[in-house]
Amino acid sequence: MHAAALGADAAMVSAVGQDARGDAALKQLRAVGVVCSAVARLPDHPTGVVRVSVDAKGLPSYDIAAGSAWDFIPSTSAVEHMAQRADAICFGTLAQRSPISRATIRRAVAGTREPAWRLFDVNLRQNYYDDAVVIDSLELANAVKLNEEELAAIARLCRLESATVVEQLRELSQRFGLKLAALTRGAGGSLLVSNQGVCEAPAPPTKIVDTVGAGDAFTAALLVGILVGQSLDEVNRSANAVAAYVCSQPGATPPLSSSVRLSVAKG
């Protein structure tokens, strides 16, 4: 949704149930311009539900319903066509918790055409992933976005030997042939490592209301910024600006202000 709000021709690959929640989800997606032709309607599985609770420090935890429609995303001609036309595709671990959706996602990512960006947004949620999914996803990707906890987990999994965060991201990129590694650090801003160099950006001063959705907003702005030709510094600044704005608003997908949208368009 954030990518569409930032002016991209955005599409979603997923599945919802033949239920009121599915109707509402599709209506909301289409209202902001997201193409939903690859979102399946499944009569035998309910639309996914996530219950979010926030602790005293403002950190969210998630109760993610099992057996949801998005655990059964079918591989269709619409998915294949969308992947072949994409300039960028974003995927994570959570939607790969079931074998059916995992196979569909892997096929879609593998079906993109060069020089499409294949960004692995790590999103390690509770016990909804295993080591094989993480490694397979890194091998499919040509870019990765992760937070500090996720980098620590991947450093252990991949036995990264580097001592510093920058060197860990470089080592990870070299091992898996990644063009870009993006590390988000909450109030500490973000760090981008690519063959263009290393770029750090601070997070703008923000009164935090709700951090849910900030990571997805960062990812959307990152990819849109790259696709419109921003420099690494511009991409980093604008992605931080979008994420900070989302943190200042209630809800995971608040309408973006015109100034925030302009920051991605101009860098």
Predicted regions and their residues:
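Alpha-helix C-terminal capping segments
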Residues: M1-D9, V54, G225-G229
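Ribokinase/PfkB-type carbohydrate-kinase core domain
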Residues: L6, Q28-R41, A56-V198, Q230, ...
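A glycine-rich beta-to-alpha transition motif near the start of alpha/beta enzyme domains, typified by
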Residues: A10-T47
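Hydrophobic residues at beta-strand termini and immediately following loops
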Residues: V13, I64, A201-P202
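A general structural signal for well-ordered alpha-helical segments in protein cores
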Residues: G22, G48, I105, L151, ...
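Catalytic-core segment of enzymes that process non-peptidic bonds
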Residues: G48-S53, A201
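Conserved phosphate-binding/catalytic region of the ribokinase-like
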Residues: C158, S162-G267
